[in-house]
Structure formats: structure tokens, C-alpha cells
Amino acid sequence: MDTKLMIFDLDGTLLDTIGDLAACCDHVLAARGLPLHTYEEYCGFVGNGVMRLVERALPEELRTPETVAAVRADFVAYYTEHIDRFTRPYEGIPELLRELVQRGVRLAVASNKFQIGTEKLVRIYFPSIRFDAVFGQRPGVPLKPDPQVVREILADLKSTDHYKGTA
């Protein structure tokens, strides 16, 4: 079977983003006089989108919908401007992606990171690599592991051969 399309997650798969997520979240927490967290704690906070990251980083008594939404807005604004201070591609990833493109494989990203952040990171770290679809978190689209974002990519790219693999 010839592989025609590969869909990748972004954070923790193509890019090591935890340093910027942690630094930016701590910046927002510090601005509000709230406790900061260790790198190791942030490793346990990430993986389900920005809303869950912020919720987990806040003290339990402040995890109201209003506070989480306000801190999320501050985080997104700050993170969008400081998204690439510590983030790096994992070793060998740019070369792998270039090799796949040379073999005629179409590439896509399906991320739980907010859409603008997803697009910005792909532009910064993979400027010479063509991605046929870059989908981040968007209103009305459930977060992964819900398959909707993958189905949207498959539909947009009119891909009909489906094989679900794991790395």
C-alpha cells in the first residue's frame, strides 16, 4: 500500500513546545499574582488544548468558567507573541517531512492547539515544507481524540484510502 497522506499532531509529535507553553502560562499567572509551576508539572497539564492547560494551572478555587476564560484570553495573546522562544522541532523531524514530500506523500497537521498558534508554528518551523492542511482547535470542533478534525482533513483533501497507524 502506497501512503498518500500522513496526518501529524503538532505538540509533542513534530515540535517540543512545552518550554514556551510553560513560560507563557507562568507569565500570565505571575501577572495575576498566582502561584507558578515547574516544568514537570506543565508536562502533566498539557495535551488537551489551551483551556485545559489554563484550568489545570489555576488554583482549584479559581477554576470558574469566567476566570478560566479570562486567563485563557491573556495566555493566547501572550503566547501568540512569544510562541517560538523555546520551541524546537524534534530531532530528525524536518528531514523526515522533506523525505515524505519527496516521495509524494501529502502532509497535514491536526492539533488541539488554537488555530492561529498552529498555523504560526508550522510557518516558523517548517517554512519550506508543504502541508496540504493545517487544522488547529476551532469553535464547534471537538478536541482530539474525537476524530472530527481528522475526518475534516480527509474530506478537504478528498482522501479515500484510510489506514490508522500509530507511531
Please describe what each predicted stretch is.
Residues 20, 49-52, 95, 116-117:
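Short alpha-helical
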Residues 31-61, 91:
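Alpha-helical substrate-recognition element adjacent to the catalytic core
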